[in-house]
């Protein structure tokens, strides 16, 4: 009979893999998955900082590959904040599809790239609201704040014209590598 510990290990999602100085995040943007990402990211960051202290002319870089259909807005913002504050240069790379809340992780990179055949999807938030009328009004106020936050983020980090951004937010349109470079969502093709 397998032990309880082995059952728990089998259930672990492992959406984040570390290979050398590369982190592969392939999964949903959720509290659990982003916690796993942050744990592995911080461990690699510390390891690379120690290595840079020992080696002359060594400039550490973390490459974060992101393939995700999106998920929780707050978890995506959390990952972006951690990446932005890294003491090691971070290159974020959109792979496959980098959608919705996953684009926040992408935006956190000191340098942003995209795979030749990858796509980015930026769109308005979606939520479910139920409750008493005043609770619904409060939720609507919060959603408006979040939408402003998303717009401010992309207006400050990209060169998407405001009218184009407003159109993108109303539809689910995937942007290819060429469009992502044009609007400075990313800096280069990886």
Predicted regions, residues:
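Terminal-region recognition feature
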Residues: 1-190
